[in-house]
Amino acid sequence: MVIAYVIARFEEERMGQGSVDWIALIEGGIFEFLHRTVLTDIKPPVFHRMMKEKGYELNKHVFEKLEMDMDGLDKNFQQRFKDYYLKSTNTLERRILRAAHYLATQWEFKIIYHTAPFIYGIDKTKENIENQIEDHYDLIGVQKILLGKKSFGFIDLCGQLRFQKRWAHIPRIPETSVLGHMFIVAATSYLCTMEMGIEACSKRLYNNFYAGLFHDLPEVLTKDIISPVKGSVEGLKDIIKDYEDFQMNEELLPLLPRPWHEDMKYFSESEFNNKIKKNQKVLLGISFHDINEKYNKNEYHPLDGELLHVVDRLAAFIEAKLSIDHGIKSEELEKAAENIFQEYNGLKISGIDFGRIFNYFR
């Protein structure tokens, strides 16, 4: 989804404001993630062959598997998920997602290719990936990334989070990457935004998703500094945050076009504060009630930072509980899970009963 964001921004710059349906892009990414969680561990060539010949049956299987999990979500969202696969159309957003998928595949494949170019059939795999990317070469973002310069540098740095482990000092199963965590927070924030009891404007949905997707981006430069360390010395948390902001401005933002910097800062700075934009200024600390009553309009760019924070903690709680349930646990892991649970037990935040959600996963 990071690559899809970059491609979509370039495409929007080329074709004009409104040319990219960002909600369709975000939901398409979530739909494809859900689809592949059911049809996991299938090699891409096999997967595409299966979808071509038995797509209807496979999609029906996916819908049945996810029916219980999606129960309670917005009914229109559930229908859009089904329509995405049953009424397949070659929209710009789908092409962007496909291009992003193949570029991500190429990025991972290069690591293997340079390590073991002698593997049987590896050159054919390389050719297949390159052919798929060529089919999307008309997208200006694809061309920019393939230049291997600044845009590729940004994606390459983000890609490193694919190999950066969460809770690296504590043995856990399953292990989770920082990049995977970022997507889970983004997708969950988006789903929660639809369930807040008010119809969120499209910019609010957009901001809550991408703030989740980029909220841990500075960790590519500072690594995963765990909360106990941040809180062990008074003022250390502020020092780390200042350093992250400095590194963002010096290392990451220069890799992106200047017009994008404002959005990227909006996503990654003070990310756990409710905020809006008014008269070209960012206003922090806006209450959930005020966002709903006064600022739930695209012109104010509302962002629910408090929601993002609790979803981030929920993701950490689930990561810990999954490992404990698998029998891989430690005193530190159990204590972390219990502390997070007690922090949100019985609380309702941004219109959502998170106490009930935490209790479900306990």
Language model features with spans:
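Long, well-ordered mid-to-C-terminal structural blocks that present hydrophobic/aromatic surfaces
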Residues: 190-230, 235-242
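Metal-dependent nucleotide-binding catalytic modules
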Residues: 133-144, 169-171, 175-176, 240-244, ...
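Alpha-helical phosphate/pyrophosphate-handling elements in metalloenzyme active cores
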Residues: 1-24, 171-207, 291-293
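Active-site flanking loop/helix segments enriched in acidic
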Residues: 45, 159-181
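His-Asp-centered metal-binding catalytic motifs of divalent-metal-dependent phosphohydrolases/nucleases
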Residues: 18-41, 101, 206-224, 312
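Aromatic- and histidine-enriched alpha-helix N-cap/loop-to-helix transition segments
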Residues: 1-2, 29, 95-100, 177-184, ...
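Histidine/acidic-rich helix-loop-helix segments that form or flank divalent-metal centers
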Residues: 68-153, 199, 203, 208-209, ...
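Divalent-cation-assisted or electrostatically stabilized phosphate/pyrophosphate-binding catalytic cores
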Residues: 46-68, 95, 176-178, 228-254, ...
